[in-house]
A protein has these predicted regions:
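N-terminal extension/subdomain marker
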Residues: 1-91
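Histidine (H) residue identity feature
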Residues: 29-32, 54, 146, 151, ...
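Short alpha-helix boundary/capping and kink motifs at helix termini
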Residues: 61-144, 165-166
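Generic structural hydrophobic/aromatic packing signal, biased to beta-strands
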Residues: 124-126, 157, 172
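Short, solvent-exposed loop/turn segments at secondary-structure junctions
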Residues: 130-133, 152-154, 177-179
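A sequence-level detector for short glycine-anchored, His/Arg-bearing signature motifs
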Residues: 141-158
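Alpha-helical oligomerization segments
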Residues: 159-179
Length: 179
């Protein structure tokens, strides 16, 4: 199987890989290549935190047409940040709400960070879906917001909410589909 068969829609957005399919392209090179090319409207942080760090997940949302997404970095009050209802799989959120337990694990730096800071280290990405986009039968998009990236972070925030340890405001990348 070759890369074109594995990533039929997103090959042009993928970081360069070797013959064993391991990413070999440097992060900074990838970001510049995307900004100089097909994703020139994307914020650097999202190219790095989402597409470069999770390239195997791109196909999940390729039907949105990544080039049409526009992003705004916003600060939201805690009450506006959605909970499990924004997840494609709402049970995923439940599996990570035990932030205090996870923070005790020395390997879970994110849980420790969020428990200490009351927020995430980098904003989650939510697709604004007020217009009820139904672009694919593969993924049922949630309304009014669908979580695209940051599943563990949003799960941990829900755990912080339950413990009354969440900060009152959080940064969020809001994605909109422009036609």
């Amino acid at each position: 199987m070759n890369l074109e068969e594995i990533y039929p829609i997103t090959l042009q957005y993928q970081p360069f890989r070797d013959e064993d399919w391991r990413v070999v392209e440097e992060e900074s090179h990838y970001v510049h290549r995307m900004l100089d090319g097909v994703l020139s409207n994307w914020p650097k942080n999202l190219l790095k935190e989402w597409l470069y760090r999770h390239p195997d997940c791109m196909e999940d949302y390729a039907f949105l047409n990544l080039e049409r997404l526009k992003f705004t970095l916003e600060t939201w009050p805690l009450e506006r940040v959605p909970g499990s209802e924004a997840f494609k799989d709402e049970s995923f959120c439940d599996n990570f709400e035990n932030i205090e337990e996870r923070a005790e694990d020395n390997n879970d730096w994110l849980a420790r960070y969020m428990l200490k800071e009351g927020t995430w280290n980098t904003p989650i990405v939510l697709l604004e879906n007020q217009d009820r986009y139904n672009l694919s039968t593969q993924v049922q998009l949630k309304q009014p917001y669908h979580l695209l990236e940051g599943h563990r972070r949003l799960s941990f925030l829900n755990g912080l909410r339950r413990l009354n340890k969440a900060r009152p405001h959080h940064q969020v990348w809001l994605a909109k589909i422009h036609t």
